[in-house]
């Protein structure tokens, strides 16, 4: 789920930025500090939308920079359990497929793709169903549900997905299900 999060903090503005807009410099520094990083219990910071820094700062003895209180908005992505996502298969391995969900990739374990037994064809980089002959490969559009997310600071979240429930899976399979149900 994407959301805007308002935060408060202190931003250090080095002397080379003195004389410039405090808000613009604060945004630049906050982007360097937070963008594309994971903040525990908040999510992956995709961008700093705006910032309002106090015009008056304070200094610390021995440091030429000024420190300003700042309030800013971050666009973040937080994976939510049972959230249904659509994405593109970015990688296929013998243990499952990785789905690009935008800011992060999620893993669909081979046991969570379909009820059919899947075999990995390493020459073509494709998973093929033994009975159904359904296949999934890099570039396929899929719909999946988040079943777990492990978020620890400093690295991107590990997200487990499933495609076994009705109307989840490769978009082509879903369209076939809908066509069969409407007959």
From Swiss-Prot:
The keyword Cytoplasm applies. The keyword Nucleotide-binding does not apply. Its EC number is 2.7.7.6. It comes from the Archaea. One of its GO terms (cellular component) is cytoplasm. Transmembrane segments: none annotated. SMART domains: S1. Belongs to the eukaryotic RPB7/RPC8 RNA polymerase subunit family. Forms 2 domains with an elongated structure; Rpo4 packs into the hinge region between the 2 domains. Part of the 13-subunit RNA polymerase complex. Forms a stalk with Rpo4 that extends from the main structure. This is DNA-directed RNA polymerase subunit Rpo7. The gene is rpo7.
């Amino acid at each position: 789920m994407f959301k805007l999060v308002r935060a408060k903090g202190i931003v250090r503005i080095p002397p080379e930025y003195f004389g410039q807009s405090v808000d613009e410099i604060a945004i630049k520094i906050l982007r360097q500090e937070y963008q594309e990083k994971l903040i525990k219990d908040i999510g992956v910071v995709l961008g700093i939308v705006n910032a309002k820094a106090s015009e008056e700062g304070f200094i610390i003895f021995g440091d030429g920079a000024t420190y300003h209180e700042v309030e800013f908005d971050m666009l973040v992505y937080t994976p939510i359990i049972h959230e249904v996502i659509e994405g593109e298969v970015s990688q296929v391995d013998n243990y499952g497929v990785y789905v690009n969900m935008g800011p992060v990739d999620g893993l669909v374990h081979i046991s969570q793709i379909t009820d059919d037994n899947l075999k990995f064809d390493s020459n073509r980089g494709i998973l093929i169903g033994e009975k159904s002959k359904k296949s999934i490969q890099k570039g396929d559009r899929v719909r999946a549900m988040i079943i777990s997310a492990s978020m620890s600071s400093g690295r991107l979240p590990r997200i487990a997905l499933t495609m076994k429930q009705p109307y989840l899976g490769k978009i082509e399979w879903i369209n076939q299900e809908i066509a069969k149900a409407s007959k």
